[in-house]
Amino acid sequence: MNRRERLTRCYSHEELDRPAVYSRTGFPGNDPSYDKLKAYLQEHTELKAGWSGFRETPYPTESYREPYSEDFERHVTILHTPKGDLQCSMMASLKGQPGMAETYFIKTREDAEKYLSLPLPKIHGDASSFFVSVEQIGDDGIVDVSLGMNPAGTVATLLGTDAFAIMSVMDRDVIHDLCQREMNIIMRRLKFILDNKIGPFFSMAGEEYIVPPIHGPIDFHDFNVRYDKPIIDLIHDSGGYIHIHCHGSIKKVFHEFINMGVNVLHPFEAPSMGDITPHEAKELAKGKICLEGNIQINRMYDATPEEIKEETELLIQTVFDDHKGLIVCPTASPYIRGEGEECFPQYKAMIDTVLEWNRRMK
């Protein structure tokens, strides 16, 4: 079974010769300390090449920068809408670290109405690059078509956590209007993609913005399920598969991922980062969802190779008892600048444990 076939069988929930093993690849930019790890992943793990070759007509914006501190500068963006301007700002690192949102486009109901006055963007793009990616990855993996953030996740990034939570109580109708708008945009993206015979592997993220403890199961259903399911249904109707990335406490809403028809769910986090153990996740997912995880990313920097080997073996024993539905994977990309050599032995231990499990079973 080659790597492409193995991942395909994970997504379609068929029996496997061994678990797949994979890592997200959002490495720190221009960091040669990770070159050795990149080469090992390329040679030994199931690969996913990302594709998002569609384009949308941009909205009129202005931006400027201003000094803030030795570590950050402030980036300000002004968005022009038919009903007036909106403004957001973020802190951009001057030292190669992640940025931080400071203020958001939507702060009030009036801001939301301004945003809703924007026309829906037109979708275009060059589909040929997708087929080039498929040819390039060959039997080593799959090409993942990213649909971006889901509707509610996009809205959450427009408002920020606090304003979203407050408006979900005080102006719930506006949240629904915003989610409906974003769903319509994603449906347009998806129809463009499907019309160009692109697929069958798709992904979305953003559901994690509407999970406990900030939001309860009712909000998860109203804002995630309600607007994700039509998208997922269209994917399934085309013969495709959907991968969802959702951190956090998901045990109380796990059944909703099943109801939506999610094919692969990443990650599934035990306390303290989440609230669901591998055993609990497998009991709920068995026969329905492929689980992708779940080695906490900090363990790749803090643990020993022997500890990672033990964690990986226990994960396989717990989740792969039916020989289906497991992609062994850390919870996030390698992310600490300059620490590639430090985490390499732990990644190698995870990967080698999966590969050796297959050899032991023969």
Show where each model-derived region lies:
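A contiguous, low-structure linker/loop signature
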Residues: E66-P119, D140
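Surface-exposed flexible segments
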Residues: Y34-E43, Q87-P98, E342, A349
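Active-site loop segments of alpha/beta catalytic cores
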Residues: M1-P28, H80, A112, L116-K362
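Compositionally biased, intrinsically disordered low-complexity regions
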Residues: P28-D31, S52-R55, L86, A101, ...
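Segments that shape or occlude catalytic/ligand-binding pockets
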Residues: G26-E70
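Short, charged/polar low-complexity linear motifs in solvent-exposed/disordered segments
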Residues: G26-F27, L37, S93-L94, Y104-K107, ...
